[in-house]
Amino acid sequence: SFSVKKGQTIAFVGSTGSGKSSIINLFLRFYEFERGQILIDGRDIKDYSQAELRRKIGLVLQDPFLYHGTVASNIQLYQEQLTREEIIEAAKFVDAHGFISQLPQGYDAPVTERGATFSSGQRQLLAFARTIATKPKILILDEATANIDSETEELIQVSLRKMRRGRTTI
């Protein structure tokens, strides 16, 4: 059992296989549980629809997946209501706008499957922009700073500090 207060940052530390990722999967209801509760704003997560939960919780993984499309469509992913201005605002917030605007086609630049043409840090910044665009109340970072290239490491650390501000972060 544990509690996380609104706006608090906590970390789960343990060896491989100790259950860190399992806890994340429980938060996101990828796994269902039979005993206990996970409450968000005093409400059991089982009472939220998957769509409601996804709007409340932003997930950034160690190895973000980018999809075939454009830079903008990867930030917008499944959030069709986002405008171009909101996409750019999210990219600026996480300091991705600089490298995106240097691409020949900017936000319309093509992205190959898995984002092979981008550095690991650039892929992570795009994943941060995708997450922040949904304005989640809770951030879940699953080793989000692992395997980052030195060129974008500082940008990622600054972006993470900004992203965590005012949000519960796990």
What are these regions (language model features)?
Residues 1-170:
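ABC-type nucleotide-binding domain
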